[in-house]
């Protein structure tokens, strides 16, 4: 029985997994993303950045679990993810202010950007790491051009400050997405096809995850 552990506070990622029939334990990593990115240097590619961040989150949660006196389960699979939008030669995470989100949306309007999502898994067996793996998915997102009134109304909801790139596909921001090339679930924050591959390489089937992590 493998317990799935999601190393993320993202409600979007949790929702994707639950809609796919799995109810994971949520353990937030709390890693210092800015410090990790600063340590990567300018040569790091967008795919490298999100993969390293995802790995750091999964590793931090795995360390937390191995340090507990009472283990969550004999067998655990920790998943860490990180998403960032690449547009105009720069990586964009969560906007820090409404003004930042407004400028980002004005630069995205009527154009497309590339959403990079890093995925990392760490398997723990009897509190020992027995498997590590990570990979990045890339999805192209096409944006509409919202009117000034619509954009201001969207910014006023606060949703844009909670997500990478300042937009959602599965929320209010979905009104302003005209198309997606690639995996839609990766845009929400965790790509099911890539996650399935990583889980399989860890020696675990989706059927086994359904059985050991049932929805309430």
From Swiss-Prot:
Pfam families in the cross-refs: Maf
Protein location: Cytoplasm
EC number, as in UniProt: 3.6.1.9
Catalytic activity: a ribonucleoside 5'-triphosphate + H2O = a ribonucleoside 5'-phosphate + diphosphate + H(+); a 2'-deoxyribonucleoside 5'-triphosphate + H2O = a 2'-deoxyribonucleoside 5'-phosphate + diphosphate + H(+)
Gene Ontology MF terms: nucleoside triphosphate diphosphatase activity
Catalytic center residues: 82
Function: Nucleoside triphosphate pyrophosphatase. May have a dual role in cell division arrest and in preventing the incorporation of modified nucleotides into cellular nucleic acids.
Protein name: Nucleoside triphosphate pyrophosphatase
Organism for this UniProt entry: Mycobacterium marinum (strain ATCC BAA-535 / M)
């Amino acid at each position: 029985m493998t317990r799935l552990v999601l190393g993320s506070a993202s409600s979007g990622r949790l929702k994707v997994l639950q809609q796919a029939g799995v109810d994971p334990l949520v353990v937030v990593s709390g890693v210092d993303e800015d410090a990790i990115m600063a340590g990567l240097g300018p040569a790091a590619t967008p795919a490298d950045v999100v993969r390293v961040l995802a790995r750091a989150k999964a590793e931090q949660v795995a360390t937390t679990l191995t340090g507990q006196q009472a283990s969550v389960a004999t067998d655990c699979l920790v998943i860490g993810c990180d998403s960032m939008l690449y547009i105009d030669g720069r990586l964009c995470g969560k906007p820090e202010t409404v003004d930042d989100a407004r400028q980002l949306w004005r630069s995205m309007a009527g154009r497309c950007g590339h959403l990079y999502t890093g995925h990392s898994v760490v398997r723990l067996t009897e509190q020992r790491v027995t498997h590590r793996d990570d990979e990045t998915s890339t999805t192209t997102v096409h944006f509409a051009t919202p009117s000034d009134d619509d954009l201001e109304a969207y910014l006023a909801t606060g949703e844009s400050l909670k997500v990478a790139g300042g937009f959602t596909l599965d929320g209010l921001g979905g009104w302003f997405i005209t198309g997606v090339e690639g995996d839609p679930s990766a845009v929400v924050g965790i790509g099911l096809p890539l996650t399935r591959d990583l889980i399989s390489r860890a020696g675990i089937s989706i059927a086994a995850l359904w059985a050991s992590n049932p929805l309430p």
